[in-house]
Amino acid sequence: MNISQEDRARLRELARQQQELAHSPRNERLMQEWIAYGASRQPARPMIRIEIDTFEQDVLPALQRCTGEEARAIERRMLRPIANFTLFADDTLVPDHYAVREHLQFVPFGLPVRRQETGGVGHHFVPYLHDLEEDMHLLGPSVYRVDEAGAQAEQAQAEDLFGDI
């Protein structure tokens, strides 16, 4: 783990802010509304979420203060729900924990997904199959892998950074 003291301080500050927001009356009310919604009880209103993933590059960089690449990736993950909650006031819940990512790999039919960037906001998936009969030999078994060591390393890093918060 190569995170500077300044970046560590920033991540700890975000962890404290996340805890504060997660235990706020508004977040607790939202949790109850989501539970009612999920149980198919009549919600008082529609639940609204803004999916920040599609435009986070326009919002999050201005909020980021970490300088190291590894720290910036963690900071970005922490900022997503905080930004939804504070900037857009949508119905996104702020979690009371830092979730370690799933360290999974999936290769459908044994063919790695190929993406071609367009230079703009979109991308194109490059197909392997053009004629199913002719290209059937390309299809193999799908591959699923779990990187337990990677997940454990990320968990240890998170515990080291803000496990006491």
Model segments located where?
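Catalytic cores of TIM-barrel enzymes
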Residues: 1-165
